[in-house]
């Protein structure tokens, strides 16, 4: 059964620069992927929206060099227009590596590194039940430059690459499921990465929240 829904994470954070917000976006991408695995869902599209801080245009070092679009918020205050973009995955997936890679590429592409951020929203679109998605068959690729199909050696290399990637994703899925099992039993902070302990990281605090609010 196709879910045809979206699922996402979003919050308002303290004012952050480009690199600080980048840490948060990576955490959100990893958490979104874990949420999809937990719900047995897959996606093929990621949407990222980053809202900029109201004080950007009050800081001379930023305002004097910003030449992008300016909007007015509901309070009548001028603020740089938010960044918004879509990243498409090459297949339906809940892979943390693929979702994170797509999200970070999107962040680098759409966010102005000069501006301070305030609000971040990350959404997975086109959700489907993981069990309803069948593996895509392997097709020989037509090489227009040589005027024919790929040679046997090239086809074998493509097949081997595809098989290796399939095995890698399967191992990653099992690891994600194992992590979810441990967190379910011992708490969300039972497993942390070194990146979760660096300055600006929010995973630990977010894991302590209930219904989106700090307990």
Per-region residue spans from a language model:
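Basic, low-complexity intrinsically disordered segments
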Residues: 1, 7-215
């Amino acid at each position: 059964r196709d879910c045809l829904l979206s699922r996402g994470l979003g919050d308002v954070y303290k004012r952050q620069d480009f690199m600080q917000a980048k840490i948060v976006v990576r955490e959100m991408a990893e958490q979104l992927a874990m949420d999809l695995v937990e719900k047995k869902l897959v996606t093929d599209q990621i949407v990222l929206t980053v809202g900029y801080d109201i004080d950007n245009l009050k800081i001379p070092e930023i305002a004097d060099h910003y030449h992008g679009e300016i909007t007015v918020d509901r309070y009548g205050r001028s603020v740089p227009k938010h960044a918004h973009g879509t990243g498409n995955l090459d297949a339906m997936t809940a892979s943390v590596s693929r979702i994170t890679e797509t999200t970070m590429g999107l962040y680098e592409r759409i966010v102005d590194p000069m501006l301070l951020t305030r609000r971040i929203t990350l959404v997975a679109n086109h959700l489907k039940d993981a069990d309803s998605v069948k593996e895509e068959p392997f097709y020989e690729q037509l090489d227009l430059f040589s005027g024919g199909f790929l040679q046997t050696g090239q086809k074998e290399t493509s097949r081997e690459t595809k098989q290796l990637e399939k095995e890698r994703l399967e191992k990653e899925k099992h690891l994600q499921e194992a992590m979810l099992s441990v967190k379910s039993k011992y708490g969300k902070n039972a497993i942390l990465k070194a990146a979760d302990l660096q300055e600006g990281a929010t995973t630990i605090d977010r894991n302590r929240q209930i219904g989106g609010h700090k307990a």
